[in-house]
Structure formats: structure tokens, C-alpha cells
Amino acid sequence: MQPGTQPVAQAQPAQAPRPAQIDRNGVLILVRSTLLALDHANKTGNYTVLRDLAAPGFQVNNAARLAEIFAGHRREGLDLSGVIVIDPQFSLLPQIEPNGLMRMTGFFPSVPKQVNFDLVFAPIGGQWRLFGISVAVGQTGPVAPPDPPVAQRPPETTAGGPKGPPPKK
């Protein structure tokens, strides 16, 4: 720095997410085992196993709090068991975020409704453990609006005007 100049704080360039170094089978294991753990927790009302499998940052939620968070799934009777046999489609391939967490988003294209997911994992003791989860059910594709009401047909016409009884002679 030159004498008489003021120090200037420079912004550090933001670190961009980078692809995760994980094979497809590893990704499928993480996604399926996580969603099945949630499915079992929702079906039994017991969230302790889901919590115990997760990272410490997720474990700040006790089992009762997790039951509150996922109460809507239980009310709707959400069944996630189909994730065992359907391959997920990824809208965001697994990537390492600047904070070191791995995130992936996508859906299982099941019919009549697809299962959408957003999962975040933390590296703990050499394993990826659940840090955040969002699961929702949505339509499998764009939904068309309802049919418009049937309009009354205008009276049929001919070149000479409205069609009616033949003229009297």
C-alpha cells in the first residue's frame, strides 16, 4: 500500500457450486433411502430413526417437531414407496454448494402424481447425511384448464339469411 492511501476492502469472488463427485448408484441410494426413511416415519408417526440417521444440523429438530413439520404428509396419506422402483429425474444434478453441503433436486415421474424432492446432505464422518429435505406431490405434467362452457349455436344461415321455413307462394 502506498503511503497516504486508504485501505480498500475488496469483495472476495463468490464460490460457485460445483458438481459432486458421486456415482449414480450412490445418488440413488441416498435419494431412495432418505425418502423411504421419511415414508416409514410418516406411516408410523415415529421420526426418531429419520432424525438419528441425519446430520447434527438436522437433529436440532426433535422427533415431535419433525412430526409437526410432516403432519401434512400424514393427513394426505402420502405414499412414497414407489420411489423404490421408479428412477428419479434430476432438475439439479448433485452439486457441492459453497458451504460444503451437497444438494440435489428432482422428481419421480409417477402417475397420477409425481413426487418432487429437494435434498441437502452434509459430509459427516466420511458419509453423506441428511441435512435438509423438502418433498411435495405435484401433477405429472401441465394441467389444461377446464373445458369452456358450451356456447349456444347461432341459428344456421344460408346465403340469403337465416334458414327458416320455406317462403309461402
Predicted segments with their positions:
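Short solvent-exposed beta->alpha transition segments
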Residues: 21-36, 40-101
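Exposed beta-sheet edge and beta->alpha loop/turn motif
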Residues: 89-169
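Juxtamembrane and targeting peptides
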Residues: 1-42, 138, 145-167
